[in-house]
Amino acid sequence: MLSYTSCAKLICSRYIVSKISFYSLKRCNSTAVVRTRFAPSPTGFLHLGSLRTALFNYLWAKKSNGKFILRLEDTDQKRKVTGSDLEIYKVLKQFNLQWDEGPIVGGPYGPYEQSSRLQIYQKYAQHLIETGRAYVSYSVPIATTKIDSSTKYHEISIDDLTDAQRKLYKSKKFPYVVRFRMKEPSPFTDLVYGKIAIKSDSREIEESNNFVILKSDGFPTYHFANVVDDHLMHITHVIRGEEWVPSTIKHIQLYEAFGWKPPKFAHLPLLVNPDGSKLSKRQNDAHVSSLLQEGFLPEAILNFIALMGWSSRQKSDFLPMKELIDLFSIDKLTKSSSIVAFEKLYFLNKNYLRRAISDVNRLDELIELVQPRLIQKFSHSSRSHDKSYTKKLLLLLKNKVHTIKEFEKIVFYFYEASDLQQIRSLVSSLITVEELPKILTTILNKFETIEWNTHEIQISLKEIAMEHQMPLKKIQSLLRYGLCGNLPGGGISDTISLLGKETVKSRLERLLLSLKHELPKRSCIV
């Protein structure tokens, strides 16, 4: 049987590593400063659950005057998606979850991308082998004369090899991994769930037995890199999803093997659909980028996910970032699964939109967000490029819309005329076909003579209603249908004023002509 030191030399023969020196086995300069981390894998779109994890880590760091660290866990090269790292950075910045240390900004404990830390992990794997807590395990081909893609392998520990076999396997360059020797797991304390003990006969224990810490390609597994990095980066609190509870027994034993003090663990409850099923990463509406594209504001989404698994104990669910930081506490995290009810998100977003539109500074930011969407959708209209016009639309419709995408839909009639057949059907349900031409003619004549503003338009509508002995509401509905179709909007006088005199005249004349069986061949577009 080989000594542990001989086993460790195998790693040295494959990788250029040196004795652990700078990366001391003891935590350097232990500090009471709270340090949390968000450690996503660049394997695709950021999920709602991941964003919640980032938020809670950010909130706890800021509440405690600590540091929020971003670390990219990119050791799974097969699942890595090109560009996902940039998408993660972009989304976090969109949500103003700015990291204090990490990629781009740097920091004292970098690099912050795990693929750039391979030698560090190999040094620590070497140490575990030397102390007997890890061992090399070869993948040996099952008796065959030719090795190809169909060849089957079985694992054999280097402890069970003779010197001759070790030399043979090394000369043939058989792949091998490094495995960690697990001991009987002990209960651990979680800040959310309290004392957790996993039964010795459970599936989690079986899957944890002597798990791989260094893969055949030289990359560490998630569990190993996670522990090494959390220690070296002085992480004090690990706040992550409930699905990582079974893995914590592996992590704690790794800490113990190195003689390190583990950080405090807080596991967040699962996110579930209203039917109780687990929220899947494959669900499009669970992707953060999809929600942004749908026109939800970042601050509304953050408020929404903050209420999942955490109790603010406030009367209002409306909690902007400053209040979230002030109120957040780990002891208010809940144990039960959190239902993702998007109705709440619509409610919150409507309130955030209304507040943003009412705030002079935020309104300008909102215009910058909305304008490109309008230009793309209504590129044929010069109005889509007019920021002052967009501002007026936002102010007019601030109480009507839940999302920016809904705003895009509602403002359609400010850029294009609605379907004429639909309009005729709508107005005919209000007023007889015989009366309509007379009323439309009166409206056109009246509008031709007035000064174009909301006040004058209101007076004109009252006069028209009196002249035709009709309720004012009926005249207002006639104009709403005739100018806007069946889309909702602001006050009709404000809407008419904002549409503009020429547009109103053009659309009413088109409707009048159609009633006289003189329908234009093409719809009017403004």
Swiss-Prot record:
Entry binding sites for L-glutamate: R37, F38, A39, E73, Y222, H223, F224, A225, N226, R240
Keyword line: Aminoacyl-tRNA synthetase, ATP-binding, Ligase, Mitochondrion, Nucleotide-binding, Protein biosynthesis, RNA-binding, Transit peptide
GO cellular component: mitochondrial matrix; mitochondrion
Catalytically driven reaction(s): tRNA(Glu) + L-glutamate + ATP = L-glutamyl-tRNA(Glu) + AMP + diphosphate
Localisation: Mitochondrion
Annotated positions binding ATP: H47, E243, K278, L279, S280, K281, R282
Record function comment: Catalyzes the attachment of glutamate to tRNA(Glu) in a two-step reaction: glutamate is first activated by ATP to form Glu-AMP and then transferred to the acceptor end of tRNA(Glu).
Name of this protein: Glutamate--tRNA ligase, mitochondrial
Taxonomic source organism: Schizosaccharomyces pombe (strain 972 / ATCC 24843) (Fission yeast)
